[in-house]
Design a protein with these regions (language model features):
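Ribonuclease/tRNase effector modules and their secretory precursors
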Residues: 1-113
Length: 113
């Protein structure tokens, strides 16, 4: 649904969980890595979407809308295993090299920064 659409954080509302329990991680991602410009793969689940961005960040977004906006449940830096699973479940046989490079860079910035 969201794949290759520009990421617009103004269309997302932070969840209570994100605000109360994950705000440090959210801010670290925003300051050190960035959320990216587009989603490279989106996995649709029962009540949510798991979206991998072009910077290697996973955003978990509710399917429900509130006043035209979706709830950002949480966000975290992806792993190669998670990205592989997301791509495979979306019908892609192989993880693109630019995605694995982005994930490795994101994890290095997060840990080393």
């Amino acid at each position: 649904m969201f794949t290759n659409e520009p990421i617009n954080l103004r269309n997302l509302i932070p969840s209570e969980h994100l605000i109360e329990h994950r705000m440090d991680r959210y801010m670290e991602i925003q300051m050190k890595i960035g959320f990216g410009n587009k989603f490279v793969v989106v996995v649709e689940m029962d009540t949510k979407y798991e979206c991998l961005t072009d910077t290697g960040v996973v955003m978990v977004i509710s399917k429900d809308t509130y006043n035209g906006k979706r709830l950002l449940i949480t966000t975290y830096v992806g792993t190669i295993d998670k990205a592989n699973a997301m791509f495979r479940s979306s019908g892609y046989p192989k993880l693109p090299s630019f995605v694995s490079t982005a994930i490795l860079k994101a994890n290095k910035k997060r840990i080393g920064g």
